[in-house]
Swiss-Prot record:
Binds 1 [4Fe-4S] cluster per subunit. This is 3-isopropylmalate dehydratase large subunit. Heterodimer of LeuC and LeuD. Keywords: 4Fe-4S, Amino-acid biosynthesis, Branched-chain amino acid biosynthesis, Iron, Iron-sulfur, Leucine biosynthesis, Lyase, Metal-binding, Plasmid. The keyword Glycosyltransferase does not apply. GO terms for molecular function: 3-isopropylmalate dehydratase activity; 4 iron, 4 sulfur cluster binding; metal ion binding. CDD domains: IPMI. Catalyzes the isomerization between 2-isopropylmalate and 3-isopropylmalate, via the formation of 2-isopropylmaleate. One of its GO terms (biological process) is L-leucine biosynthetic process. It comes from Buchnera aphidicola subsp. Thelaxes suberi. It is an enzyme of class 4 (lyase). The gene is leuC. Its cofactor is [4Fe-4S] cluster.
Length: 466
C-alpha cells in the first residue's frame, strides 16, 4: 500500500524505533524566538551540554518586540530580559540570530520561508504553535514546548508519536474578493476547533493548487485552530518558483537534485487516509468571527446566532458566554458594527501579498476618524519590498501607522494592545478572550475586510465597495 505525504516525511526521518517506546525522529530545522527559548538554554548550561547542530538552528526576535522602534529598551522589563538572553545564548552557542538591527529580522514563520530555510521534505520545529505554517512547502512542521526545545537543541532529535492522517480536499474557483483567510475560517466554522485533534492534515484540490505560497501559508498557519498537529501541502511548480534563488535554497546542481527529490513528495495514489473531508468554496462569502474562538464564524452579511435556538446545552452556554464577552446581541448583524482598531499583520497575514491586497482597498481613501489602524509587515524584507512598491505611502496617506516587523497586536505580549472594551478587526489567527489585550474584543477577518473596516470605521460587505 502507498504512503501519504505525511507518512513519507515521518518515516524517512525515523532514526530509532522499537515496540517499547515512541519513535525518535531527526529534526532538519529548529527555529527559535525570545519567548520559549530562555529556559531551554538555561537548562543546557546547567547540564553543561552543547547545541548539537548550530548550523540547523536559527533565531529571531518577534513576539514581544516593539514595532515602533528597533530598540530593545522600548519593551517592558521582562521582554528586555528575554531579548538580551537570546542575544547572549545565540552568541554562547554560535547560533545565527536575526536581532532587531538585522535586515532579516521578522516574525519567525515569515522569516524562515523567505530565507529559503524552509524547504520541502524537511522536519521543522519551533517553540510556537503556528509552526504549521511551514507545512505549506511540503514539510512536517509543528510547534513544541520548552522542554522539547531543549531536547532538540541538545540532540537534534525528538520523540514523536505517529499522527493520524486526514485529507481535506478544497475545490472551486474563489470569488475575486475571497482570500485564503476566508477559506480557512470557513472550514474551521464547518468542522469546529477539535476536529483535527491527533491528525496531520494534508490540503489538496483545485483551490489549493491555485493559491500563491502566501495563501497556502495562511491555510497551514490556521490548521492549528481546528485542533490539528500540523498541515501539509504537497510542493509543486508554485513552490519551486517561490524558493528559487532564496538565500538558503539549493543552488546550481544542488537545485536540480533537490527538484528531483521534491517532485516525489506527494501522496501515492493508493495511500489510505484515516479521514477524508471535501469542501466546495466557490460560493463562500467574506468570513468574520463573532465569538471567542475561530469556529465561531459567520458570513459577514449574516447575523450572530441566537442561543435560544440552540438545543445542545454546551453549545448554548458557549454562545451565551461569547456574545456577552463580545458585547453582542443574539441575531445582531455584523455589518455596520463599529471597530475601534484595525490590525493588519501577524504570521497569518503580514506578507507582501497581504499588504498589496489591503493597499488596493485603501488607496486614495482615508481611515475613519474614530478608528486607529496599524499595518505591521511580517519582516524587514517584506517592509523593504512594500516600500519599494510604494505601499507604505498608500497606507500612511490613508492614515494607517506603518510599523516595524513583529508579532505586534496578534497577542498582548508587547506594547501593541487593545484597551478594555475595544473592538478590533484583525488579520491574526486567534480571537480568544484577552488575546489582544485584557477585555479586548477580536474579530478575525481577511486583509481585504480589515482594510475596508478601517476606511468606514465599521464592518462592510466588501462586494458593495469594489
Amino acid at each position: 500500500m502507498g504512503q501519504t505525504l505525511y507518512e513519507k516525511l515521518y518515516n524517512s526521518h525515523i532514526i530509532y524505533e522499537d515496540k517499547n517506546t515512541l519513535p525518535i525522529i531527526y529534526i532538519d530545522l529548529h527555529l527559535l524566538h525570545e519567548v520559549t527559548s530562555p529556559q531551554a538554554f538555561e537548562s543546557l548550561k546547567n547540564k553543561k551540554r552543547i547545541v548539537h547542530a548550530p548550523i540547523k538552528t536559527f533565531a529571531t526576535m518577534d513576539h514581544n518586540v516593539s514595532t515602533k522602534t528597533n530598540k530593545i529598551s522600548a519593551s517592558g522589563k521582562a521582554a528586555q530580559i528575554q531579548m538580551q538572553q537570546l542575544i547572549n545564548n545565540c552568541k554562547d552557542f554560535n547560533i545565527k540570530l536575526y536581532d532587531l538591527n538585522h535586515i532579516n529580522q521578522g516574525i519567525v514563520h515569515v522569516m524562515g520561508p523567505e530565507q529559503g530555510l524552509t524547504l520541502p521534505g524537511m522536519t521543522i520545529v519551533c517553540g510556537d504553535s503556528h509552526t504549521s505554517t511551514h507545512g505549506a512547502f511540503g514539510t512536517l512542521a509543528f510547534g513544541i514546548g520548552t522542554s522539547e526545545v531543549e531536547h532538540v537543541l541538545a540532540t537534534q532529535t525528538l520523540k514523536q508519536a505517529r499522527s493520524k492522517t486526514m485529507k481535506i480536499g478544497i475545490n472551486g474557483i474563489l470569488k475575486p474578493y475571497i482570500t485564503a483567510k476566508d477559506v480557512i475560517l470557513y472550514i474551521i466554522k464547518k468542522v469546529g476547533t477539535a476536529f483535527g485533534t491527533g491528525y496531520v492534515v494534508e490540503f489538496s484540490g483545485e483551490t489549493i493548487e491555485n493559491l500563491t505560497m502566501e495563501g497556502r501559508m495562511t491555510i497551514c498557519n490556521m490548521v492549528i485552530e481546528m485542533g490539528a498537529k500540523s498541515g501539509i501541502i504537497a510542493p509543486d511548480a508554485t513552490t519551486y518558483k517561490y524558493l528559487k534563488n532564496l538565500p538558503y535554497a539549493p543552488k546550481k546542481e544542488k537545485w536540480k537534485n533537490a527538484l528531483e527529490y521534491w517532485k516525489n513528495l506527494k501522496t501515492d495514489n493508493d495511500a489510505k487516509f484515516d479521514k477524508i473531508v471535501k469542501f466546495d468554496v466557490s460560493q463562500i462569502e467574506p468570513q468574520i468571527t463573532w465569538g471567542t474562538n475561530p469556529s465561531q464564524t459567520i458570513n459577514i452579511t449574516e447575523s450572530n446566532p441566537d442561543p435560544k435556538k440552540i438545543n445542545n446545552i454546551i453549545d448554548k452556554q458557549a454562545t451565551e458566554k461569547a456574545l456577552k464577552y463580545m458585547n453582542l446581541k443574539p441575531n445582531q448583524k455584523m455589518i455596520n458594527l463599529v471597530v475601534d482598531k484595525v490590525f493588519i499583520g501577524s504570521c497569518t497575514n503580514s506578507r507582501i501579498e497581504d499588504l498589496r491586497i489591503a493597499s488596493k482597498i485603501i488607496k486614495n481613501k482615508k481611515v475613519a476618524k474614530t478608528t486607529k489602524a496599524i499595518v505591521v509587515p511580517g519582516s524587514k524584507l517584506v517592509k523593504i519590498q512594500a516600500e519599494k512598491e510604494g505601499l507604505d505611502k498608500i497606507f500612511i496617506n490613508a492614515g494607517f501607522e506603518w510599523r516595524l516587523p513583529g508579532c505586534s497586536m496578534c497577542l498582548a505580549m508587547n506594547d501593541d494592545k487593545l484597551n478594555r472594551g475595544e473592538r478590533c478587526a484583525s488579520t491574526s489567527n486567534r480571537n480568544f478572550e484577552d488575546r489582544q489585550g485584557r477585555g479586548g474584543r477580536t474579530h478575525l477577518v481577511s486583509p481585504i475586510t480589515a482594510a475596508a473596516a478601517a476606511i468606514f470605521g465599521y464592518f462592510v460587505d466588501i462586494k458593495n465597495i469594489l
